[in-house]
Amino acid sequence: MLNSFKLSLQYILPKLWLTRLAGWGASKRAGWLTKLVIDLFVKYYKVDMKEAQKPDTASYRTFNEFFVRPLRDEVRPIDTDPNVLVMPADGVISQLGKIEEDKILQAKGHNYSLEALLAGNYLMADLFRNGTFVTTYLSPRDYHRVHMPCNGILREMIYVPGDLFSVNHLTAQNVPNLFARNERVICLFDTEFGPMAQILVGATIVGSIETVWAGTITPPREGIIKRWTWPAGENDGSVALLKGQEMGRFKLGSTVINLFAPGKVNLVEQLESLSVTKICQPLAVSTETFVTPDAEPAPLPAEEIEAEHDASPLVDDKKDQV
């Protein structure tokens, strides 16, 4: 009964207005009140401020400044093996695995459409049919900048307007095509591992989605699909990003979906649903290397995994695995 009520609220509540209100409040300078809110947030979600370049919460003028806080360089060492792709975000893996023709796993027993995720772009979808996907959820406690899994040349970006459903266990199980319905920014790259899509998905109270090459993509929310393209290679106007480099960010966060072409990468064996991710740790390895790299994410302290799972609404998935 309670879950039915919560699900009904997802359809009834004015999610756009709640999101605008959250974005407005998070951008305001409120002095001691801003610090109080940040301190309460840090305590409730067990945010590790020792990792931040500015660990003192008084140094943030707005909640948004705190939310997109940069980390100290040394806390996320990058795996430098050229055959290894790295994790794009701190968070928890929601689902991962093979794309079955047009089907991507959303939750246990529930799929959604690859082509719908890509805004009906069947040519782009053809690049990834029977490929590999990884869906990473960023909880409120996480670092909310998104990084490149490998070197890439930006070729296309599509802004897709949509709903702003919350992303959690309940909605994943009950909202059909959740990620193909929510607002999102699709970024397509040429890489040495074939085409790669990195998709930043919005949700309720995600105030904005930004990229390093174009700034704020949303808001404004104009209700129309927008598309940009860039030249290949070293042509004038091309955008090249390096492995581990920041490519975007959420102001209040949500989900990152990565799509890889078929036969190009193998996901690291240790990864599974609910694995905790840290940027620049191994995510996948090339299928074209003669010697498979010894790629394995560094072990995390038990208290870090527990804190991440406590902050993630995806942990209810454990009930399905008993």
UniProtKB/Swiss-Prot annotation:
Pathway: Phospholipid metabolism; phosphatidylethanolamine biosynthesis; phosphatidylethanolamine from CDP-diacylglycerol: step 2/2
Superkingdom of source: Bacteria
Enzyme class, first EC level, given as a word: lyase
Topology within the bilayer: Peripheral membrane protein
Region (Disordered): 294-322
Catalytic activity reported: a 1,2-diacyl-sn-glycero-3-phospho-L-serine + H(+) = a 1,2-diacyl-sn-glycero-3-phosphoethanolamine + CO2
EC number: 4.1.1.65
Pfam families in the cross-refs: PS_Dcarbxylase
CC cofactor note: Binds 1 pyruvoyl group covalently per subunit.
Keywords: Cell membrane, Decarboxylase, Lipid biosynthesis, Lipid metabolism, Lyase, Membrane, Phospholipid biosynthesis, Phospholipid metabolism, Pyruvate, Zymogen
GO MF annotation terms: phosphatidylserine decarboxylase activity
Residues at the site labelled Cleavage (non-hydrolytic): G253, S254
Protein's GO biological process: phosphatidylethanolamine biosynthetic process
Ribosomal protein recorded as keyword: no
Bias-annotated ranges (Basic and acidic residues): 308-322
Active site feature: D90 (charge relay system), H147 (charge relay system), S254 (charge relay system), S254 (schiff-base intermediate with substrate)
Modified residues (Pyruvic acid (Ser)): S254
Post-translational modification: Is synthesized initially as an inactive proenzyme. Formation of the active enzyme involves a self-maturation process in which the active site pyruvoyl group is generated from an internal serine residue via an autocatalytic post-translational modification. Two non-identical subunits are generated from the proenzyme in this reaction, and the pyruvate is formed at the N-terminus of the alpha chain, which is derived from the carboxyl end of the proenzyme.
Cofactor requirements of the protein: pyruvate
Quaternary data: Heterodimer of a large membrane-associated beta subunit and a small pyruvoyl-containing alpha subunit.
Family, per entry: Belongs to the phosphatidylserine decarboxylase family. PSD-B subfamily. Prokaryotic type I sub-subfamily.
Function: Catalyzes the formation of phosphatidylethanolamine (PtdEtn) from phosphatidylserine (PtdSer).
PANTHER family xref list: PHOSPHATIDYLSERINE DECARBOXYLASE, PHOSPHATIDYLSERINE DECARBOXYLASE PROENZYME, MITOCHONDRIAL
Protein known as: Phosphatidylserine decarboxylase proenzyme
Native species: Shigella sonnei (strain Ss046)
